[in-house]
Structure formats: C-alpha cells, structure tokens
C-alpha cells in the first residue's frame, strides 16, 4: 500500500505544529540525539564547541531542514511512491561526517519523540507511522546516495 493522502495530511499538520516552537523543538531533537549517541556531537558544527545543546540559528536551521525534508518525503511518497533527494550532496556530506546505519535509527527515534511532543493531543499511532514511513523513505534515499 502506498503513502496515503491521510498520512500526508498528518505529517503536514504536525510539521506546522513543530514550526510553531522551532527553538524548543530543535533543542529537544538534538538533546535526544545526544542522549542516545553522545559521540554524534562532533558531527554537527553548531554543537562541537558547546556544553549541552544550546539554541542557535544554526541549530534551528538544521532541525528545520531535517524535519522539512521528511515532510517533503511524505509529499513525494504520496505523489510518486519514491523519494528523490533535492540535494545531491547529502550522501557525500553524510559520508564526510562519518554517518553510519545506527545513526539513522537514533535520528528517527529523536524525530518521532520530537513530533510526539509537537503534536500533543493529536499524537496517534497513525501519525507515528506516517512520520516513520516518510523518514524511512528519506533515509533510504540518503543511504543510496552514500553508496
């Protein structure tokens, strides 16, 4: 079964909720990542020389880009059934930063926990599944571009 219109709608509405508190949700997202994978701190230039996760324009911009790419993946999955990367350099950047498969799992977990917080009372298994499928499509495309 393909990505449904309802799944796309769920991702879009929770993406809008995420954007309402970009600062807070960005900090939460990276805090969860670093709790699970402390060594990943060095992969992010905006976190390298900080104690903990400090809000910054770079942190917000990167978090917004990650979540927006997942949202765009939902749109693509609904329209065409596949995810085509808009940025051909993503694979090379991930290789350069030393990203490996377990990092994708950590980011997925952080993304879902952050969206759960952003969605509040609208959180559901259906919403979780929509974000999971969209993220998995994006991750698969990034991994493919890394090979």
Swiss-Prot record:
Tissue and organ expression note: Root nodules.
Stored CDD domains: class1-2_nsHbs_Lbs (cd08923)
Keyword Metal-binding: yes
Metal-binding in keyword set: yes
Expression induction: Locally down-regulated by cadmium (Cd), thus leading to nodule inactivation and impaired biological nitrogen fixation (BNF).
Species name: Medicago truncatula
Protein name: Leghemoglobin 8
Phosphoserine sites (modified residues): 45
GO molecular function terms noted in the UniProt entry: heme binding; metal ion binding; oxygen binding; oxygen carrier activity
Major localization listed first in the record, in broad terms: cytoplasm
Domain Globin, first and last residues per copy: 2-147
PANTHER family to which the protein is assigned, alphabetical: LEGHEMOGLOBIN-RELATED (PTHR22924), NON-SYMBIOTIC HEMOGLOBIN 2 (PTHR22924:SF92)
Gene that encodes it: LB8
Residues noted as binding O2 in the record, renumbered to the chain: 62
């Amino acid at each position: 079964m393909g990505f449904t219109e309802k799944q796309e709608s769920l991702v879009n509405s929770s993406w809008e909720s995420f954007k309402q508190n970009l600062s807070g949700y960005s900090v939460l997202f990276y805090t969860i990542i670093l709790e699970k994978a402390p060594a990943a701190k060095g992969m992010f230039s905006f976190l390298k020389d900080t104690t903990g996760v400090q809000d910054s324009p770079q942190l917000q911009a990167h978090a917004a880009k990650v979540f927006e790419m997942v949202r765009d993946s939902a749109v693509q999955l609904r329209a065409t059934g596949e995810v085509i990367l808009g940025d051909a350099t993503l694979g090379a950047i991930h290789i350069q930063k030393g990203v490996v498969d377990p990092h994708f799992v950590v980011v997925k977990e952080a993304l879902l926990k952050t969206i759960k917080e952003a969605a509040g009372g609208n959180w559901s298994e259906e919403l979780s599944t929509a974000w999971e499928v969209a993220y998995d499509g994006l991750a698969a495309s990034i991994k493919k571009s890394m090979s």
